[in-house]
Amino acid sequence: MTALTPSATRRVRRFTEQRWLLDAVIQTVGLEWDQGRIGYSMAPCGVLAAPDFERVRSRVKKFDDIAREFAEVGVARIRRAEAARQAGHEASEREHNFIASILFGQAQWPIFENTEENQRLESLKNAAYAAYARVAGHPVRQVELRGAAGPCPVGCICRPAPARTSRWGA
C-alpha cells in the first residue's frame, strides 16, 4: 500500500525525492528510526500486546509497510476478540478490542491524506474501541466537541479534523 496518493506526492516533493533515504534508514535501524514508537504505542496495551508489536517491528522494511503491517495485526486482534466474545470470555474480548483500536490508530499515522484506506482504518479503530467500551467495566462515553461551525478544528500539518479526547471517571 502506498502511503501517499499522486496528488499528495506532488505537494511534498522533498519527502518524495528523499523517500529512498527514509526507506534505507528503516531497513537498517527499524521502525523506531525517529522515536520510541513501539514503546509508547504498546504502553496502554500492556505486555499481552508485545507479540503484535514485535511482529510489526520485524516485518516493516520500508515506510509503505507500516500501515499494512499494523492493520494486519489489528484485524487478527479483532478476530481474537470475536472468538473470545463467542466463548463468553469478556475480559479477553475487552483486551483484544482495546489493543486492536490502538493498532488501527498506528496504521493510520503514515497515511497523510483522508483516503479510502484511512477512512477504513478509522472505522475499524472506532468499531474496536466501541466494542471495548461495551465491556469496559467502567463508563466510556463518546463526546463530541463542537466549534462554531461544526466539529472543533484541530490538526498539525494536515487540515483541521474533529477532536477526540478520553477522560476517566464521571
Q: Model regions: which residues?
A:
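Short, charge-rich amphipathic alpha-helical segments embedded
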Residues: E90, R94-R120
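N-terminal cap/lid segment of alpha/beta-hydrolase-fold proteins
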Residues: F70, Q119-R164
